[in-house]
């Protein structure tokens, strides 16, 4: 590797909003503030919600349905 052309690879601290502190190595050079991490993200904690409130076909049928028509 050529000397003097690569960025410095330093150890930084990533602080999550839930209070979790993660030590990582990065070229950023300063500490990071995270919104979510693996400890508090809904997908990893199992607290995710289903957002299946109907698809495009359901919206189309609701919008263009004829009152009194048989299904």
UniProtKB/Swiss-Prot annotation:
Keyword line: Metal-binding, Ribonucleoprotein, Ribosomal protein, RNA-binding, rRNA-binding, Zinc
Source species, domain of life: Bacteria
GO biological process per UniProt: translation
InterPro entries: Ribosomal_bL28/bL31-like_sf, Ribosomal_bL31, Ribosomal_bL31_A, Ribosomal_bL31_sf
Cofactor note: Binds 1 zinc ion per subunit.
Pfam families: Ribosomal_L31
Signal peptide coordinates: none
Single GO MF descriptor: structural constituent of ribosome
Binding site for Zn(2+): 16, 18, 37, 40
Required co-factors: Zn(2+)
This protein's record includes keyword Phosphoprotein: no
Keyword Nuclease belongs to the record: no
GO-annotated cellular components: ribonucleoprotein complex; ribosome
Record note on quaternary structure: Part of the 50S ribosomal subunit.
Purpose of the protein: Binds the 23S rRNA.
Family: Belongs to the bacterial ribosomal protein bL31 family. Type A subfamily.
Protein's name according to its UniProt entry: Large ribosomal subunit protein bL31
Source organism: Serratia proteamaculans (strain 568)
Gene from which the chain derives: rpmE
């Amino acid at each position: 590797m050529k000397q003097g052309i690569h960025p410095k690879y330093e150890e930084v601290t990533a602080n999550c909003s839930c209070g979790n502190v993660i030590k990582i190595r990065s070229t950023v050079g300063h500490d990071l503030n995270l919104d979510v991490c693996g400890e508090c993200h809904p997908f990893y904690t199992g607290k995710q919600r289903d957002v299946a409130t109907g698809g495009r076909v359901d919206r189309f049928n609701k919008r263009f349905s004829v009152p009194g028509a048989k299904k």
